């Protein structure tokens, strides 16, 4: 029995006041619908039907080449009509799981519980109890059993008092779904084909209907405007921050951290305020991350430190390495064990060897730097000739004086010393001292010009 997921994503989202389709608005730098797609994949879906309408080109360009079946709903005539568009891709023996592209926080564990609750030949619906159920369809029960769902606009006063509401998420057998959708009517206050009407049909047909509930109501909340979108963003961030703390991280203020990807932490990690994580970030034990740091697709080993306001992207930090404050590691940068870069140092496609240091004001690009090297302030690897990038090699125990330019391709041998202010254009041998700056002159009796009075 295959798991066939139908994701409804056809709405325009007028209240968003945006040209972007509603489901493409982001939570943690990922579209709402992508969150739903990822969750569907995580529970082992065999097929995903994406029912779309408004903004087709933007949807397809954003979601790209994913394992999706694209189903056009040319007219938006209700949720039942939307699901009906996917019927040609649904087999009788499928379990059909219906999800919503603007409900991004639904958890895999909740969907697994819903699927487990579905009887072999029956239906399972996800419900939630709300203190204020205004706007939601009410779950109607008789002697504890679900007999139907009534929408807010069609409910009588007794039904409006019900606190258990429909989330719209349900698991239905494929053959029964086809039968019930064929029987839908739009004879209601909205003039739409309600998917929820199939629950009353199931009851009338003697089909068993079970329910499940999410751990938190926030899982099933959607976003119809930017205020609600921001609320979902905060809820998502709170959930991700909690995961980090449970895994072993101390967050200075859990409400002031942004997680926009997958972050793995070791034990005794200290994270200060206003840190942003993007992409895949792996953090070892006893790592310290200072305030305002931005860390993207990076691996950080045990005992490393990222000081405040550093930007680290596509980089690796070895054991006890440190960067910052105000440092920048660009893709391909690596700090080996005990290596250090300080304020206003930038590295790209460069390796700084074990125990080597670049304390301040340097650019190290396309460089292989050995162990025990000192990079003076103002050092620049001149790696670009206007057309191609070239490699600078600095071997172990080299001392590079301040304000030195190394014009690549160039190799500096072990133990060499480069005098401050030098421009190095040729290879330097081991243990050599190289000074290329102009010889200092002393002009005695020099008369400094004075300002002419007007």
Swiss-Prot record:
The active site is at residue 360. Residues 227-247 are annotated as: Linker. Residues 248-454 are annotated as: N-acetyltransferase. GO terms for cellular component: cytoplasm; membrane. CDD domains: GT2_GlmU_N_bac, LbH_GlmU_C. Pathway: Nucleotide-sugar biosynthesis; UDP-N-acetyl-alpha-D-glucosamine biosynthesis; N-acetyl-alpha-D-glucosamine 1-phosphate from alpha-D-glucosamine 6-phosphate (route II): step 2/2; Nucleotide-sugar biosynthesis; UDP-N-acetyl-alpha-D-glucosamine biosynthesis; UDP-N-acetyl-alpha-D-glucosamine from N-acetyl-alpha-D-glucosamine 1-phosphate: step 1/1; Bacterial outer membrane biogenesis; LPS lipid A biosynthesis. It catalyses: alpha-D-glucosamine 1-phosphate + acetyl-CoA = N-acetyl-alpha-D-glucosamine 1-phosphate + CoA + H(+); N-acetyl-alpha-D-glucosamine 1-phosphate + UTP + H(+) = UDP-N-acetyl-alpha-D-glucosamine + diphosphate. GO terms for biological process: cell morphogenesis; cell wall organization; lipid A biosynthetic process; peptidoglycan biosynthetic process; regulation of cell shape; UDP-N-acetylglucosamine biosynthetic process. InterPro entries: Bifunctional_GlmU, GlmU-like, GlmU_C_LbH, Hexapep, Hexapep_transf_CS, MobA-like_NTP_Trfase, Nucleotide-diphossugar_trans, Trimer_LpxA-like_sf. Keywords: Acyltransferase, Cell shape, Cell wall biogenesis/degradation, Cytoplasm, Magnesium, Metal-binding, Multifunctional enzyme, Nucleotidyltransferase, Peptidoglycan synthesis, Repeat, Transferase. Pfam families: Hexapep, NTP_transf_3. It comes from the Bacteria. Binds 1 Mg(2+) ion per subunit. Homotrimer. Catalyzes the last two sequential reactions in the de novo biosynthetic pathway for UDP-N-acetylglucosamine (UDP-GlcNAc). The C-terminal domain catalyzes the transfer of acetyl group from acetyl coenzyme A to glucosamine-1-phosphate (GlcN-1-P) to produce N-acetylglucosamine-1-phosphate (GlcNAc-1-P), which is converted into UDP-GlcNAc by the transfer of uridine 5-monophosphate (from uridine 5-triphosphate), a reaction catalyzed by the N-terminal domain. This is Bifunctional protein GlmU. The gene is glmU.
